[in-house]
């Protein structure tokens, strides 16, 4: 099941400014991510497991530039 994009509760970090942020919505075992500057644009959807693995990689520095 995918996130219902019409009724989704989109959230963004309180640390972000008004220009250029990602928004995240969760529904059950699904997580959706979109660009806040283009809310009607493409949306990436992940399982909760995939999203947790991505966040762990960010925290662990897996995606940092050398």
Sequence positions of predicted segments:
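Positively charged, low-complexity terminal tracts
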Residues: 1-66
